[in-house]
């Protein structure tokens, strides 16, 4: 499209090729859900800035298991393959790049219920342990918010490019 705010006539045009996001639940003999996800795009803007991104995700989420005291446990495993090929980009390295990351997350919760005369109360303490042997990308300039909606999510950074590094 034509950006009329650009001064140089050669920078006025931006080419955004179709992006894609394909997800497929894979059949498996595992007790849980195995999902493959593929994301990609190609952008050409400011005359000579080219960004090509391809991300492959393979994730597994086990079914919940409830033990004798009522703890509900499950785990998640994510393998992420990030590939980029960029020229003159401020967002990515100006070369071909490939990065493989993995994340293991254990979730446990104990649903509690207090029955009273006038009302019932519910409380569910949640315990989450994560481990990623890789370090994550520097995304401090990204607009990411961790709040109560995604605090226990395996991808709480909401990033297609990286997983949260280290352990927590």
Q: Which stretches of residues belong to each language-model region?
A:
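Outer-membrane beta-barrel proteins and related beta-barrel translocases across Gram-negative bacteria
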Residues: 1-168
């Amino acid at each position: 499209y034509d950006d009329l705010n650009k001064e140089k006539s050669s920078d006025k045009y931006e080419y955004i090729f179709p992006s894609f996001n394909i997800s497929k639940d894979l059949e498996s003999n595992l007790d849980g859900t195995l999902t493959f996800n593929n994301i990609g795009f190609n952008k050409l803007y400011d005359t000579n800035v080219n960004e090509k991104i391809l991300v492959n995700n393979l994730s597994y989420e086990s079914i919940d298991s409830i033990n004798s005291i009522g703890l509900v446990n499950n785990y998640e495993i994510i393998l992420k393959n990030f590939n980029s090929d960029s020229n003159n980009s401020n967002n990515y390295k100006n070369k071909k790049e490939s990065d493989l990351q993995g994340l293991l997350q254990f979730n446990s919760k104990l649903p509690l219920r207090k029955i009273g005369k006038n009302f019932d109360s519910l409380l569910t303490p949640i315990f989450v342990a994560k481990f990623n042997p890789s370090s994550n990308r520097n995304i401090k300039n990204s607009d990411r918010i961790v709040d109560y909606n995604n605090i226990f999510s395996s991808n709480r950074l909401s990033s297609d490019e990286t997983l949260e590094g280290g352990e927590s």
